[in-house]
């Protein structure tokens, strides 16, 4: 029995994992574990929630219970409710603090600091896009290497991308997951926005797939499993990703998946019936319901996931055609076919993910995890990064740029951009509240 001190205890009502009935249980928080018992005074817990592997801990009205909150773990999301709103707030605060303490190696989180451009040394240009660029930087006081995403406010305003950009910042601020890129800071100047993100240097999955033509099934299973956990976390946070493709998946220097670029995400979809209707994404990975234009939900990400798995296994997306209109026709109409080397388990999973009817599509992450294709995966060990990756990128440390396209790294890093200018005061108001500092050092 643990000798750690009890940090908090009390009754909460908990939803069952099997029959989904709600029962009052006695909860005790100690030693980084939240244990629950049939009643107060019991010695053997009915179950334990390990906070060191938990995802978000937040208020929740998804179960229509008063004073409800949820604790996400790799295996399931626990739904709990307290007697009063004050109790709920106290439980959430204590649980989050305990998790932060665990992830921070037992140290109290660092207090927020004011950060700006002058705090970073520019090292290398590592990416360029329509609204800005990505620069490898070093924070002068700590020596930590990051990716600085620099966006032009003028371009954002002119292309009506203010809402998307602020949404990306909001999503990055609230997510914390081993297979999603972390936001460490965000700040702004008169003419630019800055995201300070983890520097992930193992190369795009797209680059490795182009080099290898296709991956082994074991390698696809590993990457696919990490992507399942990342998508599950986004969906539980009310976010549809909408742009899953090899170019938006990076490998860390250790060989793990890191999902990046949340510019096309849609937030605020908390229930299974919530839908949106914007036509966006990358043609090869668009779900049929996006093409139909009648609104869509989180199921679109699982179609894209199926397309990505198919591409990793075979070398091309399932309905690929150089003629985009012909590709759309094939996505809507053509029968799914498989090369002879695709295993029965992989074929079964792909057929269920690439189901054209979103209501029939395999789109429940818990069912996906239990599919025979993933039978060898220990999901909690995977979440904790305790399963060795099948491939380690050839990089020397976390600051290496050898996997970055030389077309970028050969160009001197600079914060200047063509046609930039400061906005008027009214336009500047659109970017109020953009500044952010991650609450704890474990995000750095």
Curated annotation (Swiss-Prot):
The keyword Glycoprotein belongs to this UniProt entry's keyword annotation: no
Effect of loss of the gene: Cells exhibit aggregation-stage defects, with the aggregates that form producing normal fruiting bodies.
Domain of life where this protein originates: Eukaryota
Domain PH residue range list: 5-100
Positions of the catalytic residues: 243 (proton acceptor)
EC number(s) recorded for this UniProt protein: 2.7.11.1
Modified residues (Phosphothreonine): 278
Keyword Transferase: yes
Pfam family, one: PH
Any one Gene Ontology cellular component term annotated for this protein: cytosol
UniProt-listed GO biological process terms: bleb assembly; cellular response to diterpene; chemotaxis to cAMP; culmination involved in sorocarp development; establishment of cell polarity; establishment or maintenance of cell polarity; G protein-coupled chemorepellent receptor signaling pathway; intracellular signal transduction
Stretches assigned to the Protein kinase domain: 120-374
Catalytic reaction equation(s): L-seryl-[protein] + ATP = O-phospho-L-seryl-[protein] + ADP + H(+); L-threonyl-[protein] + ATP = O-phospho-L-threonyl-[protein] + ADP + H(+)
Binding site residues for ATP: 126-134, 149
GO MF entry, a single one: protein serine kinase activity
Keywords tagged on the record: ATP-binding, Chemotaxis, Kinase, Nucleotide-binding, Phosphoprotein, Serine/threonine-protein kinase, Transferase
Functional description taken from the UniProt entry: Predominantly involved during the aggregation to control cell polarity and chemotaxis. Phosphorylates talB, gefN, gefS, PI4P 5-kinase and gacQ.
Family, per entry: Belongs to the protein kinase superfamily. AGC Ser/Thr protein kinase family. RAC subfamily.
Name the UniProt record assigns to this protein: RAC family serine/threonine-protein kinase homolog
């Amino acid at each position: 029995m643990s000798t750690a001190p009890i940090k908090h205890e009390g009754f909460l009502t908990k939803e069952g994992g099997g029959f989904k009935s709600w029962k009052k249980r006695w909860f005790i928080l100690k030693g980084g574990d939240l244990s629950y018992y049939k009643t107060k005074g019991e010695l053997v817990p009915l179950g334990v929630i390990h906070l060191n592997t938990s995802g978000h801990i937040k208020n929740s009205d998804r179960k229509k219970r008063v004073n409800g909150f949820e604790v996400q773990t790799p295996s399931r999301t626990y739904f709990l409710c307290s007697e009063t709103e004050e109790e709920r707030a106290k439980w959430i605060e204590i649980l989050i603090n305990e998790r932060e303490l665990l992830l921070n190696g037992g140290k109290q989180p660092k207090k927020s600091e004011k950060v700006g451009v002058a705090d970073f040394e520019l090292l290398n240009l590592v990416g360029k896009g329509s609204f800005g660029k990505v620069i490898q930087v070093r924070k002068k006081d700590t020596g930590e290497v990051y990716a600085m995403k620099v966006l032009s406010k003028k371009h954002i305003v002119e292309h009506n991308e203010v809402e998307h950009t602020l949404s990306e910042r909001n999503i990055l601020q609230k997510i914390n997951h081993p297979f999603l890129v972390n936001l460490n800071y965000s700040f702004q100047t008169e003419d630019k926005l800055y995201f300070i993100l983890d520097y992930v240097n193992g190369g795009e999955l797209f680059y490795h797939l182009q080099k290898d033509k296709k991956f082994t099934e074991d390698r696809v299973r590993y990457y696919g499993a990490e992507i399942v956990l990342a998508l599950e976390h986004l969906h539980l946070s009310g976010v549809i990703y909408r742009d899953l493709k090899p170019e938006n998946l990076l490998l860390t220097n250790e060989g793990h998946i890191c999902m990046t670029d949340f510019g096309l995400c849609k937030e605020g979809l908390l229930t299974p019936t919530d839908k949106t209707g914007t036509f966006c994404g990358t043609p090869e990975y668009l779900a049929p319901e996006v093409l139909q234009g009648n609104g869509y939900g989180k199921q679109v990400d699982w179609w894209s996931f199926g397309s990505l798995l198919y591409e990793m296994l075979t070398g091309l997306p399932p309905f690929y055609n150089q003629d985009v209109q012909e590709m759309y026709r094939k996505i809507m109409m053509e029968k799914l076919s498989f090369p002879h080397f695709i295993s029965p388990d992989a074929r079964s999973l792909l057929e269920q993910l690439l189901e054209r009817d979103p209501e029939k599509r395999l789109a429940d992450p818990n069912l996906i995890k239990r599919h025979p294709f993933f039978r060898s995966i220990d999901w909690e060990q995977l979440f904790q990064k305790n399963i060795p990756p099948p491939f380690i990128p050839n990089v020397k440390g976390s600051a290496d740029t050898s996997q970055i396209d030389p077309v970028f790294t050969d160009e001197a890093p600079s914060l200047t951009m063509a046609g930039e200018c400061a906005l008027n005061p009214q336009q500047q108001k659109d970017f109020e509240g953009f500044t952010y500092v991650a609450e704890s050092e474990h995000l750095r």
